[in-house]
Amino acid sequence: MRKTFQPVVSYNQASFKGPSQRLLELCVVNMKRKLDANDVPSTEVEEEKNTKDADNTDFESLNLDPRLRQALIKEQFTKPTPVQSKAIPLALEGKDILARAKTGSGKTAAYVLPILQTILQKKAADPSLKATTGLILVPTRELAEQVQSVIIKFSAFCGKDVRSVNLTQKVSDAVQRTMLADYPDLIVSTPARVIANLGTSALSLENLTHLVIDEADLVLSYGYDEDINALAKAIPRGVQTFLMSATLTSEVDTLKGLFCRSPVILKLEDKEDEGAGISQFVVRCAEDEKFLLTYVIFKLQLIKGKVIIFVGDIDRCYRLKLFLEQFGIKSCVLNSELPINSRIHVVQEFNKGVYDIIIAADEQEVMGLRTSSKKSKEATDGDDEAKDKMGSSEDEDNEPEQSGKSARPEKRRKTSGKAKDYGISRGIDFQNVACVLNFDLPTTSKSYTHRIGRTGRAGKAGMALSFVVPADKFGKHKPTSFPTAKHDESVLAKIVKKQAKLGHEVKPYHFEMKQVDAFRYRMTDALRAVTRLAIQEARAREIRQELVKSEKLKRHFEENPEELKQLRHDGELRAARIQPHLKHIPDYLMPSKGRKGISSEDVGFVGFRKSGDNRIRKAREKNRGKGKGRKPSGVRKVDPLKTFNRGRK
């Protein structure tokens, strides 16, 4: 299928409000993006690669450097994924690539391996070569750290031939300038950090040969449109570009027009794509019953394995954490307020199995950061590609409740630097997640798809459980009410419709409420203790603790890695009122079927009851016979009643 790029100049520029429109204007002005190395306008050829069955390709047939193959063996990469088997050969041929594949399909290795291969070939021809030839752009710091770790693993046997720098690390500008002065081969960064270093001349892109924009559909949505605008002017012509995304949206199409030359478009659709292998359930419940059901699920161990709980904002994170703490249920909090080192460490420890429950605030989705991009899509909906997006067109009216509030989230987005580079529902590689619990239902079906994509990865089974508040139950319990729950039913209808198009079913799940109601009074006691003041104090206390762990102890832990194991993030934050009795479940509350599973019959002897007289008193009586408790000999015992002399007045 052939399409010739035709710049659109007939738009009314006054109507351009979203990042996609502003960048489309740049695409018209900055036509050098569409010229090849000989300054000749290139015709944009889109070759669609639809792959439903995995090839028999192996890493040996990809002709990679032996050092890279050795690293793959060490990391137990036995067979390339569909996106790797298609993208790597094309990348080694020097073609621009736009790949759509779900998160967890191996997109990172699909662009890291060919870039490393090219660097090693250049170093073999000229060992003294020092130049920054690769730039990898990601929307969040967490994803930057993840990509950097992949580069380190794959270049483990390359010695000093490959050097990479992560610009999102929290170091001083002087340290960052020193790292860049040595001309690292690869740079991983957010767009904002690249522009900042270009402005100070600490970074030079003159020798750049590879540009990667990972999670391309999120880069503009996270507020980097101005940075991308400036970056498009700074990148030289002829750079090989990789656009990797889980969805093909209008933002991706805009980036393609800015940076790509005749890209090959890969639409990978394997049999496990988009939620296959994930059992999806929905529970209709009142607002306070969300807490009740969460308590029952974890206290009765109804879900085995690691769980990610998605909530609407940071306050909900701490409200739920403090609530679960009172029942002895430990959990971690993950949000944009925490230092980046703490967030990365939480994810790493969760993947190692140190923690079982993470409560994550999906702030980017709730703050409405994608509303402007959705509006811009309506203006550029003429492109056929923008319509073929995993149901992205359905999301345009997914959020009616936010249309009147769009100005406030936009303002908050611009002033919130922490939230700008934080994202948890996309890109982060959570491993072996058994269940995703949507405590607060997302406001779009697109966000729902990304959330449940945290489980059921690499062909494993997973479960997604979502709480939905019916319209007639919204606002009935003010302390636990959340604004977005008002439209849960309309959002659920769109989610069900979209999942049905993908061939998946969202099934209703019914709890036996007669048995669950027995725990309601305990839930009520726990919720009373979680006051607004307790939440504010918990947030402040957590930030203080994590800042100490993140900054002052970072160097110490680098020198003493064994002590890092004691750095935990699931400690108690302490509610306003401690109620120890809530941590234990009386036998009369236990369901008859579940009583045996969590009973103490098979527990060894624990000496709670006295088995005899007081031990100290018994020892004292015994010692008296040995003389230890007797007074020295020669001292006569005196009876005070017989020797008492009142005396005369």
Curated annotation (Swiss-Prot):
GO terms for biological process: maturation of LSU-rRNA from tricistronic rRNA transcript (SSU-rRNA, 5.8S rRNA, LSU-rRNA). A motif (DEAD box) lies at residues 214-217. Residues 617-634 have a biased composition (Basic residues). GO terms for molecular function: ATP binding; ATP hydrolysis activity; DNA helicase activity; DNA/RNA helicase activity; RNA binding; RNA helicase activity. Residues 88-266 form the Helicase ATP-binding domain. Keywords: ATP-binding, Helicase, Hydrolase, Nucleotide-binding, Nucleus, Ribosome biogenesis, RNA-binding, rRNA processing. ATP binds at residues 101-108. A motif (Q motif) lies at residues 57-85. Its main location: nucleus. GO terms for cellular component: nucleolus. It comes from the Eukaryota. Residues 375-392 have a biased composition (Basic and acidic residues). InterPro entries: DEAD/DEAH_box_helicase_dom (IPR011545), DEAD_box_RNA_helicase (IPR050079), Helicase_ATP-bd (IPR014001), Helicase_C-like (IPR001650), P-loop_NTPase (IPR027417), RNA_helicase_DEAD_Q_motif (IPR014014). Residues 39-60, 370-420, 612-649 are annotated as: Disordered. Coiled coil: none annotated. The keyword RNA-binding applies. SMART domains: DEXDc (SM00487), HELICc (SM00490). The Q motif is unique to and characteristic of the DEAD box family of RNA helicases and controls ATP binding and hydrolysis. Belongs to the DEAD box helicase family. DDX56/DBP9 subfamily. ATP-binding RNA helicase involved in the biogenesis of 60S ribosomal subunits and is required for the normal formation of 25S and 5.8S rRNAs. PANTHER family: ATP-DEPENDENT RNA HELICASE RHLE-RELATED, DEAD-BOX HELICASE 56. This is ATP-dependent RNA helicase dbp9. It comes from Aspergillus fumigatus (strain ATCC MYA-4609 / CBS 101355 / FGSC A1100 / Af293) (Neosartorya fumigata). The gene is dbp9.
